[in-house]
Amino acid sequence: MDPLRAVSLDLDNTLWDTPPVLLRAESALRAWLEAEAPEIARRFTTADLTRLRLSVAAESPTRAHDLSFVRTEALRRAARAAGYDDALAERAFSVFLSARNDVVPYAEVPATLARLAARLPLYALSNGNACVWRAGLGRHFVAAVDAAGAGAAKPDPRIFARLLEVAAVPAASVLHVGDDAEADVAGARAAGLRTAWMNRTGTPWPAERPPPDYEIADLEGLERLVGRLLGAPD
């Protein structure tokens, strides 16, 4: 087996609980629209804006992986329909994105990331538009690869290929960690990476799927796993 030389980490629901973050971000956007663009708020509910994003993604399949583009374009369409210019949509998206990056890491994450980063290079690998630097965790990472920059979302092999290009190491020497059975585990396995399933909820692994190489319950479990793989004390 190739020696372990790097770890890639999914972000949402791996380093922080994402649903509350998205709820707060949507609430922040709604409050801003009500104050700064009341005609959009009057014409479009949050559910309406969600449907508009789905329409944008369906109409732009080559860019549907770029969640920032999809949301901004949906806001542009809403702004135009309500008599506002595109610049307002850009400001609205900035409000959302700021709140989107106001995350609360799981309790063990900051300290454990620091210890892991002292042992191996860490890379962020995410389909979303959260940023580890804006989220306050960037100092632990060598680099971040996201779907927008890679031109594809997990489990597409192109995003993993981009990660390997950035890390400049063979696929078999990278351990990818994430919570999604398809995007993270199946995608990483198909690209030749080792896989660790982040299972914080104790959910049984889907019986119809090939299992991950490893299963962990939190980042401290990853730290112990890395210690074993490096042949060092936990």
Regions found by a protein language model. Name each.
Residues 1-7, 19-20, 84-87, 110, ...:
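Asp-based, Mg2+/Mn2+-dependent phosphohydrolase catalytic module
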Residues 2-107:
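N-terminal helical cap/lid subdomain that shapes the substrate entry/recognition surface
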